[in-house]
Amino acid sequence: TDHGTYQKYSGFGYDLGSYDIDRYKSDKYYGELRSVFVAYLNTLNRLKISNPADLISRKAAKTHPIHYVAFEQKYRQWISANFKKAFGEELIPFTQNGNNIPLCIGKQVKFNDEEFSDEQTRQEAYEKVLETYKQVQDQGDGIKSFTGILLYLMLDYYSIFLIDEPESFLHPPQANIMGRIIGETLSDNQQAFISTHSEEIIKGLLEVCPERVKVIRITRVK
């Protein structure tokens, strides 16, 4: 938002003004600016972020990753395709749910040759189908954690991802897929620091970007 010489920057994890940015430049650790560039994906954050987002208008500032999924096709397609790699089903934002937007699990809704009297009737039929679908927040921690990582990874304004045990709650095949997704997603301008005890996470990373992987073994001294 532009207010003359003062500008407002709002989004997921940050709400800053141009004066704040100047002030944080003198902070050794950059204050709240860190949240614009660094994503911290511990277990709690991953599970919480998969809960439904508050409903907003299409033009409002996006304050939750699900808002990007709901209102921008590229994010919707990306997260659905990567979720399907692990679980065989797609993710669909339910924007007609009411006061929040959950992520539904199932097939994309397509009406073939059915005729509707108007657009409102078609949307009501679409809504009725999604009401029968499972929702991410009601599933086990494996699906919620996997979805939470995807919701962070798709936001390309982050430069650094701190990911604590991404294999948590996942079976080995899904952990391998997660390693591959992380390796495939990060651009040359991004990096991830991953704490893991999983061979499958490491194997997945090595399968897609071996030249970028550095493995550091930490041994606790008694």
Q: For the regions a protein language model found, what residue spans apply to each?
A:
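Switch/communication elements of ASCE P-loop NTPase nucleotide-binding domains
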Residues: 114-222
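Extended helical coiled-coil dimerization/tether regions that scaffold
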Residues: 21-160
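FAD-dinucleotide binding site
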Residues: 9-10
